[in-house]
Structure formats: C-alpha cells, structure tokens
C-alpha cells in the first residue's frame, strides 16, 4: 500500500495541464513499464498500458491525466505576466496562489496578484474577480528579465501545491481531477497482470479532457484501439457538503462507494453489468442520472467509429 501511495503522490504532484501532459504522462508510463506488456504514447499525448494483446474481447479503461491550469498570454514592460485559463476555474481561488511556470529551460515560481483591496472602490470590493484582472509576479522588474528566466508567452502554469494527507485517511491535491482516474485504471491492470484474463485490457491515461470537445484525447485513443467495451473513471460531485441541491444532483457521499452514471453516454448494458458486479461483491454504490452529456471522456468514446458501449464510474 505504501508503494501505491508513493506512486499516487508522484503522479498527483507532476505538472500536466491540458495540452502539456508530458511530465505526468512520463510518470504514468514509467510505472506501467514495471508490469504491463505494452506501454506507449501517441501524438495527442494519450498514454497506453496493455495486457494480453491477443485476447478478446478488448476492454478499454480510461482516466484522463490532464489537470486544469493557466497559460501566459502577455508579458508587460514591468515584467508582470497575464494569464488565461486552461480548463474551468473559479477565479476567486486563484488570488494569492503560489504557482509554477513551466518555462522552456526551468520551472519558475511566481505568485498571482490583483489590485489591493485597500485601493478598490466599495463597489469593486463586492465584485467577483475575473482572470483577466489577475497577473503573475515572478519578481522580475522588466520584460527582458522575464525573458532571461526562460519564460515565454504560451508557457503553461500550475498551482504550486503538493498532495497532502487529511484526517480520515483522505488526501487533497490540485490534480485529483482526474489524475486519480489515471491512477485507478493503471492499478486495475496491475491487479490483472498476475493472473491474465481472457480479455485484452488496455489502460489509457487520456489527454486534453479538461479542454476537449466531445472527449478530448479519449476520442483519438478509442479510434486507435477499437475497443469492444470501455469503462471511464473520472470524478464527480460529492453532495454531502453545504449548499448543494440533492434533488438535482442526487445523494453521493464522500467515502460512500463509487457513483455509476446512467443515461446519455453510459450504455445501459454496461451500467447493468457494473451494478450487478457491485451488488455481488457487496460494494456500496450510488447512481447518477446523466440525461445529457456527462462532461467526461465517455462522451467522446461512446461515439467513436461505429460506437463503443461505455460505462462511467466516479
């Protein structure tokens, strides 16, 4: 277990915003190569680990490895960096955060700033911050000094946060969405590697889910693999927190077991199979209604080629 947690921490701490997943992907593939028979990466940045490549049917297990981040859009004459969002952010959480700029030759620390509250009008104090109003300060005094640090427009940025342990055998990390899914699908085939199944099983750490339309890199990976069935592992909302409407989202407690999606991209036969296995193994689970898109890799995978029966576990 300690070895598993060590790998999970290494994976969670690796920088890998959408479109720049190379660091996190390298960590995942290095671990996969210790037991998987076939390890690869494609042009999109999807990483693959396969077992029993001649087996049948072909089962695809997918968890996206990218995280939300930021990207430099402009460097002004005073050396401040202006930013845009990679993926969906609440800009309020960005103010004052320490960040790491993934520069060409080095990782550069910085801090996100905004106009001091003392300088705001009363009306401005009540307004929510917008990302375009924020900047990153790396300590430079000019644009030339920023350039000398190896920083360029387009460089990605992540929060400077490592995984931490919380009470109740829980953890927190900036990249749990969805590095945890990439971890789970790899651990699943690790468990299978000691006693190979009849099926061919491929774990995929997919790229660009946070910014992808209709499945991001998952669509490209499913197109290549042509699986007979796919199971996507992603995160969802825990509703045992304040101010959440259970009538809309359902009742899903942290630690209450997996959440199985039903509807839209989730094939009913795969849902029934997953729920039956959970009941046979006495694994508690809840059901999440997904009448439209799931906003996960399942949306892209299930419509690939002639269609792929897909399940979604959160």
What residue spans do the PLM features occupy?
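N-terminal hydrophobic/helix-forming segments and targeting peptides
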Residues: 1-314
């Amino acid at each position: 277990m300690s070895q598993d947690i060590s790998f999970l921490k290494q994976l969670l701490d690796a920088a890998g915003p959408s479109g720049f997943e190379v660091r996190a992907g390298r960590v995942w593939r290095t671990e996969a190569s210790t037991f998987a028979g076939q390890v690869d990466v494609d042009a999109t940045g999807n990483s693959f680990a396969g077992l029993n490549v001649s087996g049948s049917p072909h089962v695809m297990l997918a968890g996206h490895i990218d995280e939300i981040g930021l990207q430099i859009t402009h460097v002004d004459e005073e050396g401040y960096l202006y930013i845009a969002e990679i993926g969906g952010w609440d800009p309020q959480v960005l103010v004052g955060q320490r960040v790491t700029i993934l520069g060409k030759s080095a990782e550069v620390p910085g801090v996100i700033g905004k106009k001091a509250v003392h300088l705001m009008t009363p009306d401005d104090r009540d307004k929510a911050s917008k990302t375009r109003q924020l900047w990153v300060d790396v300590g430079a005094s000019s644009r030339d000094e920023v350039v000398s640090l190896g920083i360029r427009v387009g460089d990605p940025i992540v929060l400077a946060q490592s995984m931490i342990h919380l009470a109740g055998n829980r953890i927190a990390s900036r990249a749990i969405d969805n590095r945890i899914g990439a971890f789970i699908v790899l651990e699943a085939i690790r468990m299978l590697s000691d006693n190979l199944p009849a099926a061919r099983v491929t774990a995929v750490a997919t790229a660009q889910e946070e910014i992808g339309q209709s499945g991001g890199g998952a669509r490209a990976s499913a197109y290549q693999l042509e699986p007979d069935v796919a199971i996507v592992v992603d995160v969802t909302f825990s509703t045992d927190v304040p101010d959440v409407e259970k009538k809309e989202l359902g009742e899903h407690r942290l630690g209450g077991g997996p959440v199985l999606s039903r509807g839209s991209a989730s094939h009913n036969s795969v849902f029934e199979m997953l729920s039956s296995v959970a009941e046979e193994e006495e694994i508690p689970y809840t059901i999440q209604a997904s009448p439209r898109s799931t906003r996960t890799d399942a949306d892209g995978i299930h419509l690939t080629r002639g269609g792929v029966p897909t399940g979604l576990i959160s």
